[in-house]
Amino acid sequence: MSRLSVRKTYKLYVGGAFPRSESGRSYTVTSDKGEFLANASRASRKDARDAVSAARKAFPGWSGATAYNRGQVLYRVAEMLEARRAEFAAQLSDELGTSRKSAMESVDAAIDRLVWYAGWSDKISAVRGTANPVAGPYFNLSSPEPTGVVAIMAPADPLLGLISVIAPVIVTGNTCVVVCASPLIAITLAEVLATSDLPGGVVNILTGHQAELAPWLAAHMDVNGLDLTGVADPALALTCEQEAAENLKRVLRPSTPDWTADPGLSRMTRFLETKTVWHPSSA
């Protein structure tokens, strides 16, 4: 007996839930061959504002968690992604037109990248923190702390690139709002995040038009950092940088990265602040 095909609905991911855009808008997603794949929600400025509010609400709890605990959560995300390798590989292959073997290699690299960042969670403070030599009877200690809410313009690489911009931001205690270039993989990844131990609001994923959302997030006064990795238009990137200057956001605008290369520590340290404490060494 034939049955009705149940098509997947691709919504937004905000505050741990999957709402539709408040505007009711959607747009068509096609494969590299122009074939219809799905309809995705087109986020509005109101959706972006809701996502920033959710990220801000989640920040105290997430930044207050131990670094070891944050590493455990990232490892759990890797575990859940490992369990859905075949699904992600099939979706990557359909969306990008690559071979199944190449897609599977990309999924495996994304899982490995999560585990790599999870391992750094409780070590980055030892690398970035210092005991400073000072004249006088004092201890002078510097330690890294998360910046706050980071808006991320995701790169075109739908999985490895996406993981590579989200993981370093959240493993150091920040929360984020991500505007994704490839909505289908991004929202499927959101399902993994929602079923892991990651608290709602730590990662918020919006799908839609980058040119519509990026300048508004750059100007938002409750956003503390801005990652422009996925912005290919120089004029749009410049506009975002100018808007971000209003409240002195930390801005990352890298050259085109090689996502298969060793990621290094630069993305983790980019959205960290340094707190220095003076303490008497004797009574």
Task: Indicate residue ranges for each PLM-predicted region.
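Terminal low-complexity tails and localization/encapsulation signals of metabolic enzymes
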Residues: 1-40, 72, 76, 108-112, ...
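Glycine-rich loop-to-alpha-helix module at the N-terminal edge of alpha/beta enzyme cores
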Residues: 33-123
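Conserved small-residue-rich beta-alpha loop and adjacent elements
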Residues: 119, 127-196
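Nucleotide-activated donor-binding/catalytic signature segment of Leloir-type glycosyltransferases, i.e.
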Residues: 202-203
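A charged, well-structured terminal subsegment
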Residues: 207-229
